[in-house]
Amino acid sequence: MNRLIIFVWAIAFSFAVNAQTKQFTDSIVVGDIAPEVISKDTLGVEYKLSDYRGHWVLLDFWASWCGDCRREIPTVKAIAKEYPELVIYGYSLDRTAEAWRNALRKYSLSWVNVSDVKGWSHSAPPFGIRWIPTTFLIDPSGVVRAVALNETDLKTQVDSILKNK
């Protein structure tokens, strides 16, 4: 009986560890060309991800209602400060413009931030996003160099890649 209990706990633990370490995306892998993202900022200005070819880009999918996203903001701000040449391209998966605008103001997000205010329906699917925040580091050629970064490894991964570019 004790062996059965230990076996069941071991299986449950392995599923929990796998769920924690599993990537937050099922479509994009390192080496892929990043899919196009086109959306507008709060003033209605359209931004295309491809407009930033020639630059390193940190593409961050987030939402105002997401606690993990809010906890990630100081890390993204620190990266933006340390790497001023890095383009931060935020894509909000909010469903209301008011919530999105309020979050931009509240957290003083000064980088490019766009949304279609349709939640997960439009821009998230090409990236296979299943959880937010999910962040991608894209090189100047548009190639994904890091996938599904999250708060715990975001700074380390960005440092590792950009300091060795």
Describe each region flagged by the PLM.
Residues D139-K165:
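Thiol-/selenol-based redox modules, centered on thioredoxin-like
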Residues Q20-L49, K163-N164:
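N-terminal "domain-start" segment that seeds a small globular fold
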Residues M1-Q23, K165:
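Bacterial Sec-dependent N-terminal signal peptides
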Residues R71-Y107, G119-P125:
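Structural microenvironment flanking redox-active thiols in thiol-disulfide oxidoreductases
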Residues R53-G54, L58-A78:
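Conserved redox-active cysteine motifs that mediate thiol-disulfide chemistry
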Residues A34-P35, V57, I132-P133:
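Short loop/turn microsegments at loop-to-beta-strand junctions
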Residues K40, R101-S141:
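Short, internal strand/loop/helix patches
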Residues G54-W56, P84-L86, L109-S110, P140:
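Loop/turn elements at helix/coil->beta-strand transitions in domains of secreted/extracellular proteins
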